[in-house]
Amino acid sequence: GDVYKRQDIEISHFGAKALQEAKVSYRITDAYGKIYSHGIIGQADIPIGNLNHIGQVDFPLKDIPSAMKLNIEVQVEGTDAVNDWDFWVYPDTVDFASEDIYQTDTLDNKAREILEKGGKVLIKAGKKVTYGKEVVQYFTPVFWNTSWFKMRPPHTTGILLNPHHPLFREFPTEYHSNLQWWELLNRAPVMQFSDFGKDFQPLIQSIDTWFISRKIGVLFEANVLNGKLIMTTLDLDSTPEKRIAARQLKKSILDYMNSDDFHPEQKVEIQQVQELFTKVAGSPMLYTKDSPDELKPKIK
């Protein structure tokens, strides 16, 4: 049968008086304002108090053609009481087109051979990366200031990316993180790119704690030897039946690598990739009771 998104709607009302026969409406739109569904959820008295159940929205998903970010807006008609929430819709089944891509979790001999011959390699390195392991990434940002809390994690403050890059064609995103990134970013290892040159830019850059500001990230593409490489520390594979955002990002990556758009602009030496698995930066234990501006670390 048809797949529906079913959403219960509750209203907390703390106005001066109860609302009589209030009519509550909804609409579901995409990023361009196209309306996919709208209507009346219910009409009822809304007493003063918390979480008054109004009704539910049943939204059919069969007409959503591809992965998409949508927004549901709920309003008490005739008032300025309105709220809205983003949500993401992904295909129920996913086919991975990966015949011409060698997938591995390290820079092994076969990966080197394929890159030498001009092939495509996807390295899903995860926790095997050592250069960057001192940086602890949560989905939530740095608490207040790492210099006042003895470098306790988390050490990052979100991500930065170009949402128009073709790698994200099938994974709708803004230039920053949003809730669809939770299962991908929370506690994901990062890579440090301090030796990759000042102009090097990963496709998904993690933003370091501001008073150290290392160049770090979780996914990059590069021309390596004679081939093309994408390397990531994100978990794209585990429990795909539950982690549907991770599953969708994996599809988007593989489809991009199989497309004519896969032309990395940056060149990286094979030794630089290898050092991500061997080099260790160490943890800068920087701590001050003064203003964090007094800390001027020299990060090598």
Question: Locations of the language-model features?
Answer:
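Low-complexity, Pro/Ser/Thr- and charge-rich linker/hinge segments at domain boundaries
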Residues: 88-106, 264
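Short, small-residue-biased leader/transition segments that mark boundaries at the very start
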Residues: 3-4
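Catalytic beta-strand/loop cores that center a nucleophilic Ser/Cys/Thr
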Residues: 127-132, 147-244, 261-300
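Intrinsically disordered, low-complexity Pro/Gly/Ser/Thr-rich segments with frequent PxxP/GP/PP motifs
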Residues: 34-65
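Short, aromatic- and glycine-rich surface loops/edge beta-strands on solvent-exposed regions
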Residues: 65-78
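A short beta-turn/strand-edge loop motif at beta-sheet boundaries
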Residues: 14-21
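Short alpha-beta junction capping motif
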Residues: 99-146, 223-226, 232, 253-256, ...
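Short beta-strand elements
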Residues: 42-45, 80-96
